[in-house]
Every structure is written in C-alpha cells, then in structure tokens.
Amino acid sequence: MSTISPDEQMQSGDFEAPQSKILCSGTNSYLITEMCGEGAFGKVVKAVNMATSQEVAIKILKREDAARREMWMLKAVSALDPTKSNVVDFIERFQDGGQTCLVFERLDMNLYQLLQQRRGHPLNLSEIRPIAHQLLTTFAALESIGVIHTDLKPDNVMLVNHEREPFRVKLIDFGVSFMRSENTRGMKTQPIGFRSPEVTLGLPVSEAIDMWGLGCILLFLYLANHPFSVDCEYQGMKGIVDMLGQPDDDFLKAGIYSHQFFMEDKHWCNPGWSIKTPSEFESGTGIQVKEWAGDIGSLNDLITLHPVLNGSIELQDRRAFVSLLKGLLQIDPRRRLTPQRGLSHPFLTMVHLMDNMESPYVMHCLDSMGVLDLDDYDDEEDFCSDVVAEEDPWVEEASVVPQSEDTGSAPPHSSVRVEELDPPCDETAAAGSSDVVAEEDPWVEEASVGAQSEDTGSAPPHSSVRVEELDPPCDDTAAESQQLPDAAQETQLCEDTRPARVSRLKRMRKFFGRIVKRVKRLFR
C-alpha cells in the first residue's frame, strides 16, 4: 500500500483528521493516530484502544464483498497459533459508518520499508536466513489448513519489532487468499514480479505458488532490487526464461495463456515453443511492453555478486543459499520445494557450517537465528522427513564443499558427507511415476485443454498430451537408473542405509537447535 501524506489525510473525504477520529466497536473504542496507506480494497490506520492503550492496526474496507472474503479467510487462519505460525494476530471485526473494520495487532515496518531504511543496502545471508525459516514455517502451517496466500510480496511481510527482535517477521493480508479446494485455473493472482509461471500461463495452482513468491522475496532481499519486472507481465515471463530457462513443452501446451507469451512451431520435424519478441507480444495482445533490465543472468551469479569478506566459509554459505533459491524457483511446480522440504535444506539447517563452529561468521549466523522460537526444537521430527531424504536434490548440491579462494584447493572436508545428506537415489519412483503424476498434479489432468485462439477466440483442438507422456518429478534419477548397470543393487543399498542417514540428519538438527538456544541465552 502506498503511503499517504498528512495533506492527503486532511483532504480525504472518507476520514476526518486522524487526531479526532474515533472508531467504535461493540466493546472497544479506537482513537486513530496515523494514516498508514491505501489500497484497492481499503485503507489502513494506526490506532490505540482507548480502554487498554493497546496499539493496533485497523483495516477499513471499501467493499462488502471484499470484507466477507477476507473474514472467511481470517476464520480459517484463526485455527493457527499466530505466534508459532508467524501470521498477524486478528483481534476483532466491527462496522463503523457502513464500513467494515478489521482490527489487527500493531506491527513494525514491512520488508520494503526495511530496505528503504537501509538506503538500498541488501540483507546479508545471516539476516535472510531467519526470515526464510519463519516464512517457510508460516507456509507449512497454511498448507496444513489448505490456505494459499497468493499475495506474497515485501509489503506483506512485516517485522514485529525490529529494534527488540531483529528480523522477527509475520505474514499479513489474507484479502485475496483462497482455499486449496477452490477452482482457480486461469485466475490472474499474485503481483507481477512475484507471479509464478503456472499463474502467468493459466494452469491450475497450488500451494507451490507461495513457494515461488518466497523465492522471489529472498532474491529481492539479497539484490535489494526486484529480480523480475513488477509492472510488465511479458517482461516478467521473459525474465524467468532468461534467468531460469523456458518451461517444458508439455507445460506450455497445458496453459490457457501460453500463446500470449510463446509461439508454437508445428511445421518442423521437431516442433517446439519459443518466447515471443516484444513486438510479437504487442501485436498479439495490444499491450505495450515496458523496458526492463535484470541485475543477474543466472542464479549462480549470486555467488560472486557481492564482495566476499569471510573466505571459503561465506562462499559455501552462498552456494547453499543459491541451492535453496533453485529449489524454490523451479519452473515446474511439481519439482518445487515444499515448506517442509525447505525447512530441511542445508541453508536453514546450517550443516555445511558445522566444521567452522568457532568462526566469527558462523557465530554471527547462529546469533541471528536466536530470534526463532526453538522451545520445541529438539522434539521436531517433521523437518527430517523421509521425503527429504529420498528426493531432495538441493540437499546434495548445497553440501558440495567449495574451492578455496586463495589456493584453489578444497578446504578441509566437513564431517557431514554428501552421501549422508541423501542424494536422490530412488529409481523405483520412476516406475510408478505415471500413477503419482495422475494422482498429485492437478494441471496434468487438464493438460489436454488447449489455449484460447488469439485470432478467433475459440478453443483449438485438444492437445494430444497424455499423462503418461509428462515427465515425472524424478525423471532425472530415472534416466540415471537406465545408465547404471547395477541400478537395482544401488537402490536396495540406498533403501537399506536411508534410516541411518535420516537419523544422523535429525541428530544434526537437534545439535544445532541446542547451540542456537545456548547462544540465545548468552545474549539475553
């Protein structure tokens, strides 16, 4: 939401001067102290409960349908503990002057304002890590109740109290959220610049769109700039293709809007898709393409983007961060990290830093994680699920020890071996992949639905794509299994040793949990 100046506050016809306006519910009276901002659905003000002196934020909605929608989602989210799940605490709803008022706890500033306060200086990894952990925890909680936020952007992630609890954050604004069970195919949700490929191209959506949005936010914090265009949908899609690669052909065939952004060549022996030029997009849609130039060409550029101040330890941490981003920014939502798998990623567990516990860099990283609520850390089992152990390629990639800057030789090996972090080795998954895809991938079922014709507006003939032709999530491991002569034996070995490796990973998580809690106590 945009900031409103004092002059605009005084001239507004909907509000009196903030110092004199009182909003009354059935049980409480709130004195408005400041106008915060205005959006499409309403205005937000800061206020004080006149009876208890509690500071609150009040969202005053213009439209009743928007109010009903947001209340419905807030009731669903109220099943969660707002502190443990890092969502804004909703207090009450009331009517005042025919307008619906929603009262929330008062928070500090949002992430966009934080970067403004830092004068455009990006966050470092020790600051990004606790934010990533908290938001992954939030989305794991939302996933458990079937809620998709859909509006993840820096403005909707707020610091609780940055002075007392640095980088403690909460997620706000459920005004355009929806339930997993709702039919949302073709809905243009998510802000441009944080919009996932499946939303842009018109495929069915899932909780995976929030994981994409999270990846964009973490990248935004590290760059101190938007990674993709925020005001041109074409440039947003082209930026994704330039940085991450083009969506697979079967993915494009399934999209309602794919023909707006891509051209399908059917005249060659090997037909395929290619992204349109700006002029082709403009002539086909009538929408003018805006200029955009990104900061990086690929995610790997992030490793050396900023000066390295802590040698190979920091480089290793950057590689882990890039690995996390690659998991969150997978174009295919079936391959994208889930919240639980994200929480088990080495960048969050910091297992790659274990051999350098006395390093000032590592101690600073541990200190920054002290903002997390780790009272039950030792008892958590979800973070090290079998799914992560069997399927997560990002764990293996982030565990590779980087080369030393000075000598080019590898630094001392970590006691955490790559094989202990469970690289993907489940060749048997490929055999049953068709069933898995058919059961779990909502957009596959509708892959035969063609895009609307640009010229006539009529639907073209159904695509010949079949479920069994689509690449399953584990197709890379399936290809490897065909090349290895002893694949069956290797699979059996992996299955025999997996429980021990999962147990070791759990012990490492508990070890780090105890360390973080000790550091947290030292700094109290």
Predicted features along the sequence, with ranges:
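Conserved N-lobe ATP-binding subsite of Hanks-type protein kinase domains
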Residues: 43
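Activation segment signature within eukaryotic-like protein kinase domains
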Residues: 131-132
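Activation segment/activation loop of eukaryotic-type protein kinase catalytic domains
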Residues: 155-191
